[in-house]
């Protein structure tokens, strides 16, 4: 178990579909989640996010919140390179497979788990899904779906069913497109009458 006792709060929740998208031998799955199953049916009931939590000190019987703050990661660089390569019409497979090979460890089998280069859309979604698994909880997905597109130069994934886990677009393009920009806080507006609120938000 997590052994957090009465400390901390569970502020981050993920849909079961996301957990089930991992291969069982992908080490990132169990390093990121503690899964809970029904004792009779053995059906997944939910997950607890445990990545970057720190460690439990057996001697003091306390949880130590000492996880490293993630600033920049080599896996992130590889996946950014994959995005660039995809925009240039190149082969993204080697970058995705660099990341997968580390994640699968000794169980890595390129013929079974490796990615093969495809068309722009397939590549773009493969990069996004790999980032989902690799950069989980690191505050990047929102910016990914704003930046990445379904077709080259096309609609951002934030408005596409393909950009979500459950098939529902993150934002409704017809009614929520304004949300890709942040509002200006009320206090700032009150102090400067020349400022205008970002279109779409209440003034």
Summary of predicted features, one role per range:
Residues 1-12, 18:
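Polar, glycine-rich mid-to-C-terminal structural blocks
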Residues 23-203:
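Acidic/polar-rich alpha-helix caps and helix-coil junctions
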Residues 12-28:
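N-terminal short leaders/motifs
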């Amino acid at each position: 178990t997590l052994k957090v006792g009465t400390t901390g709060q569970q502020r981050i929740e993920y849909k079961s579909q996301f957990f089930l998208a991992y291969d069982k031998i992908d080490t990132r799955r169990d390093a990121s989640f503690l899964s809970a199953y029904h004792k009779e049916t053995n059906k997944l009931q939910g997950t607890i996010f445990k990545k970057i939590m720190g460690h439990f000190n057996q001697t003091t019987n306390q949880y130590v919140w000492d996880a490293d703050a993630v600033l920049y990661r080599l896996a992130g660089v590889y996946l950014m390179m994959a995005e660039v390569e995809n925009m240039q019409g190149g082969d993204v497979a080697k970058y995705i497979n660099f990341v997968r090979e580390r994640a699968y460890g000794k169980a890595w089998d390129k013929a079974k788990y490796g990615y093969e280069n495809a068309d722009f859309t397939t590549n773009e979604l493969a990069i996004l899904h790999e980032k989902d698994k690799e950069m989980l909880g690191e505050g990047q997905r929102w910016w990914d779906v704003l930046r990445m597109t379904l077709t080259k130069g096309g609609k951002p994934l934030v408005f596409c069913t393909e950009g979500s886990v459950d098939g529902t677009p993150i934002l409704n393009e017809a009614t929520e497109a304004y949300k890709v920009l942040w509002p200006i806080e009320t206090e700032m507006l009150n102090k400067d009458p020349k400022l205008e609120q970002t279109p779409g938000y209440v003034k």
